[in-house]
């Protein structure tokens, strides 16, 4: 063995083994009006069937249906790597005759996950915190309109500072290639005009692989992704492909010339899953946490009457109360006690070190 070799080069292997053993968690939200192929696309993306037991309401029932939040989980294993996927669905979004404030349950749900994580993170037992925060939201846009509708804009404005948004055009096989490009540009212009932040692809380092740089640029340019989903396998010539057959031909789900399905799956799974989680924690969650601390620091914010007033305000205007007052004071006392014990322990260690040093100096003199 080389005498100059210490062994730090093996550190990535340690991290790899630890990550593989622990597995990965990822929470994905899908939102958008009914009939845009959300369920089919999710099943196509992850090669699973998350909607076996779903009952689809008829058209008359949809007009009175209110938005609900459904959470489904599945463990996917591939090549020894386990991913615990949690899918958050929003059936009923935009289906009611009156869609006023229909996005508020989604906003509350996202903030509740932040609040729960904050509680767990502030507790004494922080070893096994379950991360239920929403890491990404696929927002489906209709291919039949002329861009974003007022409801789309209102929803995206309400959540764009709370979750990574990936806009997708559902059922893109309804459009010609030229129509797809026009609609994409229209949506990009509207997002910029309305100052709506969507997920920003990180800039590649100069030493990144050239193939990865090329893929990253291609994914950036394809936003919003025009997608088609299908669980059906059809034959195109002699090849079995997943796609949809029409009288005029076959749309192949995994053909990059037909739609952006491959780019979307590559981004979500192969290249940017970890970055989506890091942005959620470092930027979106920290922003929520800062707003909570600011709301507690305001004069009178800890007064019960004031807290009651704040809780009645729209979830889009102010963060949810972080903790009940009694719980907050208890947590502060526990933290103070923990800090006091740590300070005492540190002082004892310093005293012991000084005593040992003094004894060592005395023995040297002798």
Curated annotation (Swiss-Prot):
Which PANTHER family does the entry link to? Answer: SEPTIN (PTHR18884)
Matches recorded under CDD domains: CDC_Septin (cd01850)
Which GO molecular-function terms appear in the entry?
A: GTP binding; GTPase activity; identical protein binding; molecular adaptor activity
What is the native source organism of this protein?
Rattus norvegicus (Rat)
Q: Where is the Septin-type G domain?
A: 22-295
Any S-S bridges, and between which cysteines?
Answer: none
Region entry G4 motif, spans? 170-173
According to UniProt, the name of this protein is: Septin-1
- Family the entry assigns: Belongs to the TRAFAC class TrmE-Era-EngA-EngB-Septin-like GTPase superfamily. Septin GTPase family.
Taxonomic lineage of the native organism: Eukaryota, Metazoa, Chordata, Craniata, Vertebrata
According to the UniProt entry, which residue ranges have a biased composition of type Low complexity?
Answer: 349-366
| G3 motif: annotated segments | 89-92
**Keywords on record:** Cell cycle, Cell division, Cytoplasm, Cytoskeleton, GTP-binding, Nucleotide-binding, Phosphoprotein
Q: Which residues carry this modification: Phosphoserine?
A: 206, 247, 306, 314
Q: Where is this region: G1 motif?
A: 32-39
Question: What domain of life?
Answer: Eukaryota
